[in-house]
Amino acid sequence: MPTINQLIRKRRKSSLARKKSPALQKCPQKRGVCLQVKTKTPKKPNSALRKVAWVRLSNGQEVIAYIGGEGHNLQEHSIVLIQGGRVKDLPGVRYHIVRGTLDCAAVKNRKQSRSRYGAKRPK
């Protein structure tokens, strides 16, 4: 344990909280280009093939982003918009691709939670 004099000479350093989505640089969304589109398997109790994309952002950083919804039209060189939001059972995936913007099409035949998947109101 430090003495009073040691604390006067050098203060205790307060630990900074880790940022949840540092690549966005305090922006709500960022644009990027898909480098590759693949599937990843989730952590232990779950089993699936989750669709993810490696994206190079407009600030030069590369991140892994999750493609939500059933089916997608993304491929290499697609321009996408990403936002923060991790996927709990995929380590390293801290961003989501916004559906229905830029090159990413909306989810077809979506009736509920449409705004999350860029789907228009059915007639």
From Swiss-Prot:
InterPro entries, A to Z: NA-bd_OB-fold, Ribosomal_uS12, Ribosomal_uS12_bac
Gene Ontology biological-process annotations: translation
GO cellular component: small ribosomal subunit
Domain of life according to the entry: Bacteria
Residues with the 3-methylthioaspartic acid modification: 89
Biased composition (Basic residues): 8-21
UniProt entry keywords in alphabetical sequence: Methylation, Ribonucleoprotein, Ribosomal protein, RNA-binding, rRNA-binding, tRNA-binding
Xref: PROSITE patterns: RIBOSOMAL_S12
Region (Disordered): 1-25
One annotated GO molecular function: rRNA binding
Keyword match Transit peptide: no
Function: With S4 and S5 plays an important role in translational accuracy. Interacts with and stabilizes bases of the 16S rRNA that are involved in tRNA selection in the A site and with the mRNA backbone. Located at the interface of the 30S and 50S subunits, it traverses the body of the 30S subunit contacting proteins on the other side and probably holding the rRNA structure together. The combined cluster of proteins S8, S12 and S17 appears to hold together the shoulder and platform of the 30S subunit.
Subunit structure: Part of the 30S ribosomal subunit. Contacts proteins S8 and S17. May interact with IF1 in the 30S initiation complex.
Stated family: Belongs to the universal ribosomal protein uS12 family.
Full protein name: Small ribosomal subunit protein uS12
Protein source organism: Chlamydia pneumoniae (Chlamydophila pneumoniae)
